[in-house]
Amino acid sequence: MQPIELAELLTSQAAVLTSLVVIGLILCFIGYKIFRVYSAVIGLFIGQLVGIYITINYYENALIVILASAIVGALLFALIDELGLIVTGAAFGYFVGVYLLPEYQVYAFVLAALFALINLFIEKPLTVLITSVIGASAIALAVHMGITGTHIYDILNDPKKVFDAIFSNAYFDLLWFTLVLTGIITQYVTYKEEREEEE
């Protein structure tokens, strides 16, 4: 299989929708439990971006640098929980700011910094909330894309389009809210049961 064929397969509508639903369900219902894995994936992507930056500006052997930096990023984020908490909180705050105040970009950065710091201090409740919201958003986006036929390329150009798609009508709002609430309750009950088993 040629790289172009593989890229077309991975970005096909079925692959994107399936990925969004599976990742959304995992994050929504067991996001806090697998936070170390989730954090490592974030580190992998950030390391990959750093590797791409290095190869563009300083180095010519792209594959080795990108792989090495991605692995280092994944290991750092897996071993140091605070990095994942900061990035998760910052991303959540940024997207909340972009959605609520799209004309004032500076507030998105302020909210990103605020949520990054808050997530360090109230890790459990905020991480449960964030993973439930991200998971529910991924599922609602997949449902919207499946119904309307919107492709992922149409969404990636503007982050606000993600929120517009998720909250486009009352049915999607209800789906999103139900998933968030169910995710929070499920994660809380699972956490409580694990604590009782340990005692």
Curated annotation (Swiss-Prot):
Signal peptide coordinates: none
Its membrane topology = Multi-pass membrane protein
Alphabetically list the UniProt keywords: Cell membrane, Membrane, Transmembrane, Transmembrane helix
Report the subcellular localization.
Answer: Cell membrane
GO CC annotations, alphabetized: plasma membrane
The record ties this protein, via Pfam families, to: TM7S3_TM198
Task: Please give the start and end residues of each transmembrane region.
Answer: 10-32, 37-59, 63-80, 83-100, 104-121, 126-148, 163-185
Its recorded name reads Uncharacterized protein AF_1434
